Amino acid sequence: KVTGGTIKQYDNLKLYPQGIDVLIKSIQMHDDPVTESVYPARVGIAVKGAKPDEVGRGDVISAEDVVDVKTEIELDFKKSPFYKNDIAENQGCLVSVGLQIKAAKFLSISPLKLTFEKPIVCKKNDIAVILKPESTTIRILGSGKIL
């Protein structure tokens, strides 16, 4: 999915969070080959430079320095009014940003800071949803924009 800008055949881009250099060999839109695709578009791309086991759900292909790869983020957090439990420092959770879902821990509550076990790809103002899968009631703890 093209979420911003343009992607062209033979572009040299990077696969994040790994930072692998990739070459766009071909682009398909609705089963038809195209030479470029502009936001917003759903595309299929063939890349050179990355093996299938190096690519995972939520990985991002982008020009260099457009996205951030972070192991720690700060959020403008709004707790869900339906989530009744308290949150504490060092408590574990899952964080969803785009198609990525990564394990994290709370570093601080006010302001809300999270630290990740594995790096996450994000941009400023992306929405992060915080989940507690082991919760017996509601599993969505809240959300906020990445600062």
Model-based region annotation:
Residues 1-147:
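C-terminal effector/interaction modules appended to NTPase cores
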